[in-house]
Curated annotation (Swiss-Prot):
Keywords: Antiport, Cell membrane, Ion transport, Membrane, Sodium, Sodium transport, Transmembrane, Transmembrane helix, Transport. This is Na(+)/H(+) antiporter NhaA 1. Its main location: membrane. The keyword Transmembrane applies. One of its GO terms (biological process) is regulation of pH. It is a multi-pass membrane protein. Residues 1-408 are annotated as: Na(+)/H(+) antiporter NhaA. The keyword Cell cycle does not apply. Na(+)/H(+) antiporter that extrudes sodium in exchange for external protons. It comes from the Bacteria. It comes from Mycobacterium sp. (strain JLS). GO terms for cellular component: plasma membrane.
Length: 613
């Protein structure tokens, strides 16, 4: 299957809208770089040049404009300035997940969302049992966050079997975790508000909300207003990194629309035939605007955050001076052990218990192929709290010595969380190895129910899960005809519905129309019409196609509109089968009950079927 076809995703498009290998390797490299700079910071802070470490990061940088003057240390410039880009990327991901990603499907998202909330509350409660009062109690926010970059990288290092579903669960959990951590910063780690700059910030946020209506130059407008918002929040004594989140959540996100993509393709053809500046500008604009600015910014800014901002942040904040005095103080510090217990025990217990409760009560269900044992391993790994944890250490604790004790706690917790997760995955994979999902057809072919072409007793069976609005399914019809011609009576072909409504908004109605035609014995005839007119799938169009293939239009209307329950259940039953098998793109083929992996051109399908004789 091509990369483009993998983008045609339904309920959970963000999981599959990117190349499945590139982001994972990028995440791993980013986590490795973050770890390297963490080690470098520790070595630097404990080397003969340790004094230069603190001297450099404490160096002050000042900017003045008339009577206004802003002065920050290099460390605060990193934490307050550069880290705004980190929170900007987090905000973009959160917005994307809520609008077109994991969190759009409330039933699928319920378990990781509730687990994430428990993973925020339980660690804080455990920390406060160690530090119920005094200045250290203010550091409870250190234990609520999971470091997404380290989480993904550590999962790749541990290499549990079949990690795809677990990875999606943990990323969904991490999104909610980030929302909670950012909310904690806004609500509990901001004080001494200045109302005038805060009012200016509110006006800037309103202006940012209107930028989407501009016909052009939206990118520069977001940048200028975002920088102004950062300054306003800084002057208002609100943590200015929240400007990154505010800008991100106001940037629109959407899935590519097929019609707009096709219009851009037409412009490319026109440019090829007649290259000129006008067509070049139109093509550039069409390509740019067919993808949401949210996705474009994630792609453009994300690598700089992963490979520049976060390593610099680690270098600035992880330099714990591990002399005998610091280690001795940390080993006897309730602050240190409160952080360790909160992150390691709190995350593990909170996430695992909440998941078990949701599954047992039926309030939510785990995705196919994901068991409580797998979640437990991921929950342990969620105890790696680094980026935001170190960030809150600097915000919540004023005493440098206590900051070092807290950083030691974060480092110890990260090592213990990784070790615990590794042990859990190794033990559970050995005791009860997970099985891959979706490799076998979940429901056998039933000639009385399924839509079939060919002899029901044929030795070869090809099942397709498809979508009438999917252009790749439309192209596959020619391949299917070639395959059927090649095998003749030896092949039974079966069509099952898998309408990907989020990517193809008319696909479900098209499937209903085909079922209405099936009631009059013309299922495949209607399918031909639907594939031939994929850009015209309004109900008025489908009634025209019904007339064109000779249906009784009154009966068709009764079947699809008046007495629609049978039609609806039929389409949903097929779609639910696809969900159980964790299918994610169309077309998906099964050859003799086994999922076909790889290209689906006629030659490839013929080879796969021949191998099954």
């Amino acid at each position: 299957m091509t990369e483009a076809s993998a983008r045609t995703i339904g309920p959970l498009p963000s999981r599959f809208s990117r190349d499945p290998k590139t982001p994972r390797s990028t995440d791993n490299a980013a986590a490795a770089l973050l770890l390297a700079f963490t080690v470098l910071a520790i070595l630097w802070a404990n080397s003969p040049w340790a004094q230069s470490y603190s001297t450099f990061w404490d160096t002050h940088v000042a900017v003045s404009f008339g009577e206004y003057r802003a002065e920050l240390s290099v460390k605060h410039l990193v934490n307050d300035g550069l880290m705004a880009f980190f929170f900007f990327i987090v905000g973009l991901e959160v917005k994307s997940e809520f609008v077109i990603g994991e969190l759009t499907d409330r039933s699928r998202a319920a378990v990781p969302v509730v687990a994430a909330i428990a993973g925020l509350i339980v660690p804080a409660v455990i920390f406060l049992t160690f530090n119920p009062s005094g200045p250290d109690a203010q550091a409870w926010g250190v234990v609520i966050s999971t470091d997404t970059a380290f989480l993904v990288g550590a999962l790749a290092v541990i290499k549990p079997k079949f990690p795809a579903r677990l990875r999606i669960f943990l990323l969904t959990l991490a999104v909610v975790d980030d929302v909670g951590a950012l909310g904690a910063i806004a609500l509990f780690y901001t004080d001494d508000l200045k109302l005038a700059p805060l009012a200016v910030a509110a006006l800037l946020i309103a202006a940012l909300a209107m930028v989407r209506r501009l016909p052009s130059l939206r990118g520069p407008a977001y940048a200028v207003l975002g920088f102004a918002l950062w300054i306003a929040l800084y002057l208002a004594h609100v943590h200015p990194t929240l400007a990154g989140v505010a800008v991100a959540v106001l940037i629109p996100v959407f899935t590519p629309e097929r019609r707009q993509v096709e219009q851009t393709v037409d412009l490319v053809r026109a440019f090829r035939q007649s290259p000129n500046p006008q067509y070049a500008r139109a093509v550039t604009r069409g390509l740019r605007e067919s993808i949401s600015i949210n996705e474009r910014l994630q792609t453009a800014v994300g690598p700089y955050v992963s490979f520049v901002v976060l390593p610099i942040f680690a270098l600035a904040n992880a330099g714990v001076h591990l002399d005998e005095q610091t280690i001795t103080a940390a080993m006897s510090s309730t602050l240190t052990w409160g952080i360790v217990a909160g992150l390691v025990v709190g995350k593990f217990v909170g996430i695992t218990a909440a998941t078990a409760l949701m599954s047992a009560t039926g309030w939510g269900q785990l995705a196919p192929g994901l068991s409580l044992r797998r979640v437990a391993g991921g929950a342990a790994l969620s105890g790696i709290g680094f980026t935001i944890s170190l960030f809150i250490v600097d915000v919540a604790i004023e005493d440098p010595a206590r900051q070092d004790e807290a950083r030691v706690g974060v480092l110890i917790a990260s090592v213990l969380a990784f070790t615990l997760s590794w042990a859990l995955f190794r033990i559970t994979d050995w005791i009860s190895p997970p099985e891959p999902v979706g490799l076998t057809l979940v429901r056998p072919v039933d000639p009385e129910r399924d839509h079939i072409r060919g002899d029901p007793d044929a030795p070869l069976v090809l099942v397709e899960y498809g979508d009438y609005e999917c252009p790749f399914c439309g192209r596959a019809t020619g391949a299917i005809d070639e395959v059927r011609t090649h095998f003749g009576d030896d092949l039974l072909y079966v069509w099952r519905h898998f309408p990907l409504e989020r990517a193809h908004p008319r696909s479900f109605d098209a499937a209903r129309a085909s079922e209405g035609a099936a009631a009059q014995g013309k299922f495949f005839e209607m399918g031909r019409e639907l594939f031939a007119h994929q850009d015209d799938l309004e109900w008025s169009d489908m009634y025209r196609y019904a007339v064109a293939i000779g249906l009784d239009i009154e009966q068709f209307d009764q079947d699809v509109r008046v007495h629609a329950s049978k039609v609806l259940h039929r389409v949903r039953d097929d779609a639910q089968d696809a969900e159980v098998m964790d299918l994610n793109s169309t077309p998906t083929f099964f050859v003799n009950g086994k999922r076909h992996k790889g290209p689906w051109d006629a030659a490839s399908l013929i080879r796969a079927l021949e191998a099954g004789r």
